[in-house]
């Protein structure tokens, strides 16, 4: 159902979400394929369908604009803008730095007996954290993001990665702003 998407396009200042752009792109591709199939048939074939498709506009320029921004998974392409590509590269770099530093802290904590030998990095509230037994929670400097239901385990973001994680969050906010800018631009073009 495209009506809600088309209605949303009509609202000045609004923008389509990536998945809405993907749905519109899919519909435009389908329309182009159907019209192309019918019009490519030999003369005399499907006369009624040919008559129906004669006036159908398939908007190739809009389809190309959507394809430039939206990928086959319905997400905004990194290549949609140089800015987005740069931001996403920086995000990947920061994620790698955080993972490497967390792994170092975790290994040190394991060898010191502060955390269990089978402890693994996990995510709590969007932050990479280390699970630490309640008795050892003061032995790792950092920010406590969560505790287990039993209260026996605390999930700590080590101080060594707090700044890197803050930078990562800032990059994710930049990414979100750039994606919204691209989708707003694309929606205005569709309008």
Place the predicted regions along the sequence by residue:
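Conserved amphipathic alpha-helical "coupling/scaffold" segments
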Residues: 1-87
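Alpha-helical coupling/stalk and coiled-coil linker elements that connect catalytic or binding modules
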Residues: 15-19, 47, 63-191
């Amino acid at each position: 159902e495209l009506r809600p998407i088309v209605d949303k396009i009509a609202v000045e200042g609004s923008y389509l979400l990536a998945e809405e752009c993907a749905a519109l792109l899919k519909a435009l591709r389908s329309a182009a394929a159907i019209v192309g199939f019918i019009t490519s048939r030999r003369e005399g074939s499907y006369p009624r369908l040919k008559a129906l498709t004669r006036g159908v506009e398939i908007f190739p320029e809009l389809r190309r604009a959507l394809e430039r921004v939206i990928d086959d998974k319905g997400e905004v392409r990194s290549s949609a803008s140089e800015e987005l590509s740069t931001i996403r590269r920086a995000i990947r770099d920061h994620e790698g730095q955080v993972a490497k530093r967390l792994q170092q802290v975790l290994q040190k904590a394991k060898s010191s007996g502060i955390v269990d030998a089978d402890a693994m990095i996990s995510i709590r509230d969007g932050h990479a954290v280390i699970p630490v037994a309640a008795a050892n929670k003061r032995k790792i400097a950092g920010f406590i993001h969560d505790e287990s239901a039993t209260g026996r385990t605390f999930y700590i973001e080590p101080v060594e990665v707090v700044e890197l994680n803050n930078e990562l969050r800032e990059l994710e906010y930049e990414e979100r702003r750039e994606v919204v800018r691209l989708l707003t631009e694309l929606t205005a073009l569709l309008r």
